[in-house]
Amino acid sequence: LKELSKVCSRSASNLGVSKPDRPKWKKDVVVITGGSTGIGRDVVQHLSRKFGARIAVLDITEPTYAPAKYGAPDILYVRTDVTNKDEVAVAHSKIKDHFGNSPSIVVSCAGVALAGPILTTSSRTFSRTFDINALANVILAHEFLPYMVENNHGHFMVVASSASYFSLPLLGPYSMSKSAALAFYETLRAELRSVYKAHRVRTSVVTPTKVRTLLGHALKDSDNNFLTPVLEPIQVASAMVDTLDSGLGRAISQPMFTSLLPYVRALPEWFRGLLTTVGNTDSSVTAESIANSFKAGYGKNWNKDDFANVFGEMESMVRAFAKKKKKNRN
């Protein structure tokens, strides 16, 4: 029964075409957004070293990479705000000029974790988070998907989060935007099947828990390292690269137990409340953990004018936390 379920899921995830359509790494071009740091950086290095892949990185931060293996193509970096359709179009033009053809693989890895309580977090912060974590997927699809559909070949991979399924206090902007990213993936897969009839264009979604990146600092480490360990970027990146190379789409859940998270929404409210209590999820994000992420360097390369209100909100929250902590000590 388990094997039958696995076969059926594989067929559904690949629009009824279960035969692998593996990339031709010497021909296909890979676009990776957010490829300068974190998970994206490890995906870039892994693809370059293992397959000598032709890669373009779209990011606002210039990358620094260890040398790829001898003979691997240079990694093209194009400074790009992925929420700006004109900049993405310019990047596409540069990619075609550099490699000679359009990308057939897109890894949408750019993301931000902006946090704060709903009542004191500005609509601008919510909007900017949605722009980067959700709307950017639409802009990337508009720019790169037509080539994939035309050739009935390619792979569109979206990095969402376990927060897509399970929301946490103070993480509203992030959780909501990642839920939207998950919905984008599901809609894209459905339209490739029913609207565009591009059954060999693969789609994948990645939903990890906390990863040891600057972004991940905003979330406290779990008390249970067995059930919810802190993931290393290379763990997630390796699973992503293996999926791309397989020529099949799938949902990548890490650690393994997170594959059960979609079922949480079907549980009675009292049981979901019990999970919250047992897992102590209400204290997963605090003003202190958010402050620690910025102290570690998170956000240092952001456009300060664009995110001015965000920094102001974060500073206010951290000051309030410090004041409360001092009061408790006294």
Predicted region positions:
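Canonical Rossmann dinucleotide-binding motif of NAD(H)/NADP(H)-dependent dehydrogenases/reductases
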Residues: 16-56
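SDR active-site lid
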Residues: 191-258
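Active-site helix of classical SDR
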Residues: 141, 177
